[in-house]
Swiss-Prot record:
Provenance organism: Vibrio vulnificus (strain YJ016)
GO cellular component entries: cytosol
Keywords: Glycosyltransferase, Transferase
Name assigned to this protein: Pyrimidine/purine nucleoside phosphorylase
Top-level lineage group: Bacteria
EC numbers on record: 2.4.2.1, 2.4.2.2
Any Pfam family hit: Ppnp
Reaction equation(s) it catalyzes: a purine D-ribonucleoside + phosphate = a purine nucleobase + alpha-D-ribose 1-phosphate; adenosine + phosphate = alpha-D-ribose 1-phosphate + adenine; cytidine + phosphate = cytosine + alpha-D-ribose 1-phosphate; guanosine + phosphate = alpha-D-ribose 1-phosphate + guanine
Gene name, Swiss-Prot/TrEMBL: ppnP
Family: Belongs to the nucleoside phosphorylase PpnP family.
Enzyme class: transferase
InterPro entries recorded: Ppnp, RmlC-like_jellyroll, RmlC_Cupin_sf
Function statement: Catalyzes the phosphorolysis of diverse nucleosides, yielding D-ribose 1-phosphate and the respective free bases. Can use uridine, adenosine, guanosine, cytidine, thymidine, inosine and xanthosine as substrates. Also catalyzes the reverse reactions.
GO molecular function: guanosine phosphorylase activity; purine-nucleoside phosphorylase activity; thymidine phosphorylase activity; uridine phosphorylase activity
Signal peptide: none
Length: 93
């Protein structure tokens, strides 16, 4: 089954799915600043575009380009700065 999600007044949209018992989602973020909370640990891979992120405990912002990935701890949050429309894959670890 595919689960549709919309966040931040429709500026972030994703499609969630399960493959061989593993949950993932693919989506697009329009330019803007966002804060996401996590329940489970996540790995985010930038498919096209770029994400500038700051996780809880980080002192500086980090930029991830297409093909690069970062992980976020469960039960935490992270801030995103999106300058161009960006596609991503989120894997729930």
């Amino acid at each position: 089954m595919i689960k549709e999600n919309s966040y931040f007044a429709g500026n972030v949209k994703s499609l969630g799915f399960n493959q061989q018992g593993e949950d993932s989602s693919v989506g697009v973020m329009l330019p803007g600043n966002y804060t996401f909370g996590t329940d489970a640990p996540e790995r985010m891979t930038v498919v096209k575009g770029a994400l500038v992120i700051k996780r809880e405990g980080d002192e500086e912002w980090s930029t991830y380009q297409a093909g690069e990935a970062f992980e976020v701890a469960g039960k935490s949050s992270f801030d995103l700065q999106v300058e161009v429309a960006t596609a991503y894959l989120c894997e729930y670890l």
